[in-house]
From Swiss-Prot:
GO terms for biological process: fatty acid beta-oxidation. It is found in: Cytoplasm. Heterotetramer of two alpha chains (FadJ) and two beta chains (FadI). Catalyzes the formation of a hydroxyacyl-CoA by addition of water on enoyl-CoA. Also exhibits 3-hydroxyacyl-CoA epimerase and 3-hydroxyacyl-CoA dehydrogenase activities. Pathway: Lipid metabolism; fatty acid beta-oxidation. This is Fatty acid oxidation complex subunit alpha. It comes from Vibrio vulnificus (strain CMCP6).
Length: 705
C-alpha cells in the first residue's frame, strides 16, 4: 500500500494541474518541514511538464485551506541558524511555485493563515469562498515571530505598505470580503463555484502583471522620505502599544523596510535571519507555550463523564454580567436564552445590550439585517419563570448576596427540570455554601466569568464536593461553545484568579500609601506588560467590589490578605471608581486623569522614590507567591492552568508565559532571594511560601521544558 501524501498532483484533460493539499491523519492542513522533499519533487515535475495551461492549488479538506506552519517543528530547533534554515526552506519552495511559467491560482476555502497565506501569496492569483469560515491573515506576531516564508516581502508589494503593516503587526485575520477589498484576493465567490472561478483565471493564460503602484503608494513606500515617515510613525505607535516588550514588532518593521529599500532578495535574507533569532527568544517561547496550552485545553473535558446536551440556557439577572453571558450563549454557543430579572427594565437592559453588540457586527458587515433579527429572536425574557422548565443550564448572575443566591437555587429547583444545572457566576462566595440548602447539590457548580464577558476569554469552573462529573463536563463543554477557555478550580475563597489578584492589588495600595504617585504605579505595571495598571483596574472593577471581596479572603485564608485601609475612606467620599465618575481617577467620557484630591483625602504627599522595576516587582512577587500556594493547595490542577488563568483572567503579560513560566525563567533561587530582600525591607507579606522554598532548595522547576 502506497504511503499517503500531503500534496496530491493531478492533471486533467484540459492540461490544468490540480495540487490538492491533504495532510494525512490531521483535521487541519499545516505545513511541515517533513513535506519539503515531496513539494520539491512536485514543483520539479510541474516545471518540466510541457503544455500545462496552469496550476490550481486547493485543499482536499472540507473546511480549511492551510491553517499555517506546524508550530511544533520550531520546538526541535536548538539554535537560531536551525530555525533560520527552516524559513529559508519555505522561502525557496514558495519561490519555485512563483517561478512556474504559467498562471498559478490558489483556491481558498476556510482558514488560510500564516504559512498558508504565504503559500497563496506566492501564487499569481487568489480566489476565496465568501463563507464565514474563510479567514486570511499572518498571525505569526502573536507567537512572537514574523512571517518567515516571504510574507513580509510579498504582502506589501501586493496591497501596499500601510495595510500590510496593519495586518502583519497585529496578526489580525480578514474575512473574505475584506480580503477582496484590500486586494489580498482577486475574487470572492460562493464555495460552490470556487474551483470553476479558479479555472477561469487559469484559462486567461496570463501570469500576474506587475502591480500598478498608486500615487499614494509611490509617496509612502516608493520614496525614501515617505518610507522614513511611515516607519517612524509605525515604530512610535507600536512602541506605545507594546512598550518594547515584543521584539517581533521591531523585527517586522526592520525586515519590511529593508526589503523595500534593498530589494526582495535581501529582504528575504533578513526575514529568515530575524525569524531564526525570534524563534529562540524568551518572548516567543513563552507565547508558543500559551498556544500549545490552549490547543491542549480545547481537547480536554474537565471530567471523566460525558457532557449532556444543552438546548436552552436560562440567565438570572439582566445586569452587565447577565447581559454578556446571554450574548455569548446566543452568538457563540448558538443556543436560545431566556432571561429573568426582578424588573422589566432589567430584561430590557440585557436585550438592548445584545442588540447593540449584534448591530455593531451588522455595521461591520459581519451580520446581515436578517441574521441580526434571527439572533435577537433567540433571546427572550420576563420577570417570572416562564420557559425555565425547558432550560438545561441556568446561569445565575445576581448580586453577591448568599441568601439571595440560595433563594435562586430554590426557585430553579422548583421551576426547572430535575436535571437542570444551576451555575452561579459568583466571584467570591463559596459554591458549597450556595448549594447548602439545595435538594440536588450535584447539579450546582460555579461558573465565574470575567467582565466584559463578550471580550474576556477565561471562565473558572468551580465544582464543590457534591458536584457531579456530568455537571462539570456539561458546563466545560458549554463554556467552550461560548468561546471561552475554561479552567477547573477548587471551591475556596477567591477561587484562583481573584486569589492571586488580591495581594497584587493590596501591594499597589501599600505603595500608594508610601507616597508614590498614582500614575507612576500604573505606568510601572503597564511597562512590565499588564494591559492596565492596578490602580486603574481597581477603578474599573469598582472600589465597592474590592471592599466586599477582601474581607471574605481575610476570613477564609488569613491575615496575609489584609490590605491597607483605603476602601472605606474612598467609599465614604462617594468614590466607587469609573461607574461613579470618580475613584483614584476622574472620568469625563473616555478621558481619565488622576484625581489629585485623593492624595489629600488619604493624607499623602506624592513623591516618586522607587524605580519602575521595584514598583512592578513589589506588586508581582506577592501574586507569584499566592499562585504557588494555589498550586500546592490544589486550587488549580497544574502550572499550565495557572498560567492560562492569569493571562486570560487578569492580563498577566503573555510574553512572560504566565506566573509559573515567569518564575522558571526568573530562577526559583533568585526569586526566593529577591522575596527575602523585600521581606526584610517591606514586611513579612513578601516571605516566600513553603512550596517555593522547597522547590528552590531542590533545584526544581514548574515545567520540565
Amino acid at each position: 500500500m502506497s504511503e499517503q501524501k500531503a500534496f496530491n498532483l493531478k492533471i486533467d484533460e484540459q492540461n490544468i494541474a490540480w495540487l490538492g493539499i491533504d495532510v494525512p491523519n490531521e483535521k487541519m492542513n499545516t505545513l511541515q518541514a517533513a513535506f519539503a522533499d515531496e513539494m520539491k519533487a512536485i514543483f520539479a515535475q510541474l516545471k518540466d511538464s510541457s503544455g500545462l495551461k496552469g496550476l490550481i492549488v486547493h485543499s482536499l479538506k472540507p473546511d480549511n485551506f492551510v491553517a499555517g506552519a506546524d508550530v511544533r517543528m520550531l520546538e526541535a530547533c536548538k539554535t537560531a541558524p536551525e530555525a533560520e534554515a527552516l524559513a529559508r526552506q519555505g522561502q525557496e519552495l514558495f519561490q519555485q511555485l512563483s517561478d512556474l511559467p504559467y498562471p498559478v491560482v490558489a483556491a481558498i476555502h476556510g482558514p488560510c493563515l500564516g504559512g498558508g497565506l504565504e503559500l497563496a501569496l506566492a501564487c499569481d492569483f487568489r480566489v476565496c469562498s465568501d463563507d464565514d469560515a474563510t479567514r486570511l491573515g499572518l498571525p505569526e506576531v502573536q507567537l512572537g515571530l514574523l512571517p518567515g516564508s516571504g510574507g513580509t516581502q510579498r504582502l506589501p508589494r501586493l496591497i501596499g505598505l500601510l495595510p500590510s503593516l496593519d495586518l502583519i503587526l497585529t496578526g489580525k485575520q480578514l474575512r473574505a470580503n475584506k480580503a477582496k477589498k484590500l486586494g489580498v484576493v482577486d475574487a470572492c465567490v460562493p464555495q460552490t463555484i470556487l474551483l470553476d472561478v479558479a479555472k477561469q483565471f487559469v484559462e486567461k493564460g496570463k501570469k500576474r502583471a506587475k502591480q500598478k503602484v498608486t500615487t499614494k503608494e509611490k509617496l509612502l513606500s516608493g520614496s525614501g522620505l515617505g518610507r522614513k515617515f511611515v516607519f517612524e510613525q509605525a515604530a512610535k505607535k507600536t512602541h506605545e502599544k507594546t512598550r518594547g516588550n515584543y521584539p517581533a514588532t521591531v523585527a517586522i518593521l526592520q525586515v519590511i523596510q529593508h526589503g523595500l529599500e534593498k530589494g526582495m532578495k535581501q529582504g528575504l535574507e533578513l526575514e529568515a535571519k530575524r525569524f531564526g533569532e525570534l524563534v529562540m527568544s524568551n518572548e516567543s517561547k513563552a507565547l508558543r507555550s500559551i498556544f500549545f496550552a490552549t490547543t491542549e485545553m480545547k481537547k480536554e473535558t474537565g471530567s471523566e463523564a460525558k457532557p449532556s446536551k444543552v438546548g436552552m440556557v436560562g440567565v438570572l439577572g439582566g445586569g452587565l454580567m447577565g447581559a454578556g453571558i446571554s450574548h455569548v450563549s446566543v452568538a457563540k454557543a448558538k443556543v436560545p436564552v431566556r432571561i429573568k430579572d426582578v424588573s422589566n427594565d432589567g430584561v430590557l437592559n440585557a436585550l438592548k445590550y445584545n442588540y447593540k453588540l449584534f448591530d455593531k457586527q451588522r455595521k461591520r458587515r459581519i451580520l446581515s439585517k436578517a441574521q441580526l433579527q434571527s439572533k435577537m429572536l433567540q433571546l427572550s425574557g420576563g420577570t417570572d419563570f416562564t420557559s425555565f422548565n425547558r432550560t438545561d443550564v441556568v446561569i445565575e448572575a445576581v448580586f453577591e448576596d448568599l441568601s439571595l443566591k440560595q433563594q435562586m437555587v430554590a426557585d430553579i429547583e422548583a421551576n426547572a427540570k430535575p436535571e437542570t444545572i444551576f451555575a452561579t457566576n459568583t466571584s467570591s462566595l463559596p459554591i458549597h455554601k450556595i448549594a447548602e440548602k439545595a435538594q440536588r447539590p450535584e447539579n450546582i457548580v460555579g461558573l465565574h466569568y470575567f467582565s466584559p464577558v463578550e471580550k474576556m476569554p477565561l471562565v473558572e469552573v468551580i465544582p464543590h464536593e457534591s458536584t457531579s462529573e456530568e455537571t462539570i463536563a456539561t458546563v466545560v463543554a458549554l463554556a467552550k461553545k461560548q468561546g471561552k477557555t475554561p479552567i477547573v478550580v477548587k471551591d475556596q475563597a477567591g477561587f484562583y484568579v481573584n486569589r492571586i489578584l488580591a495581594p497584587y492589588m493590596n501591594e499597589s495600595a501599600h505603595i500608594l500609601l508610601a507616597n508614590e504617585p498614582i500614575d507612576k504605579i500604573d505606568t510601572a505595571l503597564l511597562d512590565f506588560g499588564f494591559p492596565v495598571g492596578p490602580i486603574t483596574l481597581l477603578d474599573e472593577v469598582g472600589v465597592d467590589i474590592g471592599a466586599k471581596i477582601m474581607p471574605i479572603l481575610v476570613a477564609e485564608l488569613g491575615a496575609r490578605f489584609k490590605g491597607p485601609d483605603v476602601f472605606d475612606v474612598l467609599l465614604n467620599d462617594g468614590r466607587k471608581g469609573r461607574k461613579s465618575g470618580k475613584g483614584f481617577y476622574t472620568y469625563k467620557g473616555k478621558k481619565k486623569e488622576v484625581d489629585k484630591s485623593v492624595y489629600k483625602l488619604l493624607k499623602l504627599t506624592p513623591e516618586s522614590k522607587l524605580s519602575d522595576n521595584d514598583i512592578a516587582l513589589r506588586c508581582v512577587l506577592p501574586m507569584l507567591n499566592e499562585a504557588v500556594r494555589c498550586l500546592d493547595d490544589g486550587i488549580i490542577r497544574s502550572p499550565r492552568d495557572g498560567d492560562i488563568g492569569a493571562i486570560f483572567g487578569i492580563g498577566f503579560p503573555p510574553f512572560l508565559g504566565g506566573p509559573f513560566r515567569y518564575m522558571d525563567q526568573f530562577g526559583l533561587k533568585e526569586l526566593v532571594e529577591k522575596m527575602n530582600q523585600f521581606a526584610e525591607k517591606y514586611g513579612d507579606r513578601f516571605a516566600p511560601c513553603d512550596g517555593l522554598l522547597t522547590r528552590a532548595g531542590e533545584g526544581r522547576r514548574f515545567y520540565d521544558n
